[in-house]
Amino acid sequence: MATNEPEHEHRDEEEAGANEDEDTGAQVAPIVRLEEVAVTTGEEDEDAVLDLKSKLYRFDKDANQWKERGAGTVKFLKHKNTGKIRLVMRQSKTLKICANHFVKSGMSVQEHVGNEKSCVWHARDFADGELKDELFCIRFASIENCKTFMQKFKEVAESEEEKEESKDAADTAGLLEKLTVEETKTEEKTEAKAVETAKTEVKAEEKKESEAEKSGEAKKTEESGPST
């Protein structure tokens, strides 16, 4: 005669099966260990002197129209050692470089016609890995940010111009000093040569006089004849 198992035994078996699926708390080591990799941006030796969100455009000469370069943050970065300042802009999501060039003497920036939030400038840009002449237009969220950008741009360009003028003045002073030293040395050599020539002439004259005296004495001796 078959007997039915008690209901509580079924419950015990179900609970035991459930317990087997429970987390035991044991830690499982990952099959592949990923190491942290230091990410470098090339900006480690520079300090940001300006940092503004913006959208950048470049003028496509072939299509004769403005094309968006990217939206992100534009920075003026000052090198800690050389003091040179470059303009760098990266796309906010991909961090791809949109613009990368030094701000140099003679560069200028001006407001984009009809839009006080935008400004334009020419630059020799290196964003694509090679120098290219680019015409950029940058747009900001506010007029104030645009003015701040333009003011900083002009300050940097003027500062570079002053540095070049100072360097040119120093180079000119150094050249003049070198020329003065060379002229002095030339004059000294000329004077020394003149003195040496005078000495040589004096010696030659003295030699002639000495020879003349000797010749005169010899002639007198011949004229007087032998003594008797």
From Swiss-Prot:
Domain named RanBD1: residues: 27-162
GO biological process: mRNA transport; nucleocytoplasmic transport; protein transport
Pfam families for this protein: Ran_BP1
Highest taxon above the source species: Eukaryota
Subcellular location as annotated: Nucleus, Nuclear pore complex
Name of the protein described by the UniProt record: Ran-binding protein 1 homolog a
Tissue localization of expression: Ubiquitous. Preferentially expressed in root tips and gynoecium.
Gene: RANBP1A
Region (Disordered): 1-30, 159-228
GO CC entries: cytosol; extracellular region; nuclear pore
Annotated keywords: mRNA transport, Nuclear pore complex, Nucleus, Protein transport, Translocation, Transport
Description of how the protein assembles with itself and partners: Interacts with the GTP-bound form of RAN1, RAN2 and RAN3.
Basic and acidic residues biased stretches: 1-13, 179-228
Gene3D superfamilies: Pleckstrin-homology domain (PH domain)/Phosphotyrosine-binding domain (PTB)
Acidic residues bias: start-end ranges: 14-24
InterPro entries assigned: PH-like_dom_sf, Ran_bind_dom, RanBP1-like, RanBP1_RanBD
Major location category of this protein: nucleus
